[in-house]
């Protein structure tokens, strides 16, 4: 597994949606979005996620907290925090796998704690980092290495490039 780097995401209640939108851009080979573009993409994704809940009501209503209509109405608000149900719906809206990572004590890289949208493949997922307290950041593979590992970096970069091109 490639080392991962975190891209700091603004904590404005949209962090989950910003992180997923950021990761989707990177996965598609686009440039990392600016803060203002992140906000716009996050709000668009949030609206589509709320619509996806309604579309999949029979499958989702049972695992949402409280009244379904109230929950969806709350999720449409720009500062409502998202969690596992929203990550699942993000994977459906985007048609992409999403992995949630979290650092554990003494680990160099965060470990995967949840996976969504595996029906869309397992290669090159959108990666988000959960801090354990409600905030999400975007994660992306880091191709930077020390001088001692440059040869391996070239190999990994070559492999990573072609695995992304095939996706």
PLM segments and residue spans:
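Deubiquitinase catalytic domains
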Residues: 70-167
């Amino acid at each position: 597994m490639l080392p991962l780097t975190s891209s700091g995401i603004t904590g404005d209640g949209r962090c989950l949606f910003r992180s997923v939108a950021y990761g989707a851009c990177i996965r598609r080979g686009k440039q990392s979005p600016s803060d203002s573009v992140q906000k716009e993409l996050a709000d668009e994704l949030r609206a589509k996620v709320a619509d996806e809940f309604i579309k999949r009501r029979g499958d989702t209503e049972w695992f949402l907290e409280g009244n379904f209509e109230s929950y969806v109405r709350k999720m449409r608000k720009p500062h409502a925090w998202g969690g596992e149900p929203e990550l699942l719906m993000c994977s459906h809206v985007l048609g992409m796998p999403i992995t949630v990572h979290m650092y554990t004590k003494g680990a160099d890289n965060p470990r995967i704690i949840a996976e969504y949208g595996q029906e869309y493949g397992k290669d090159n997922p959108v990666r988000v980092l959960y801090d354990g307290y409600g905030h999400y950041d975007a994660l992306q593979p880091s191709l930077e290495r020390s001088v001692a590992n440059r040869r391996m970096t070239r190999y990994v970069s070559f492999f990573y490039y072609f695995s992304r091109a095939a996706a």
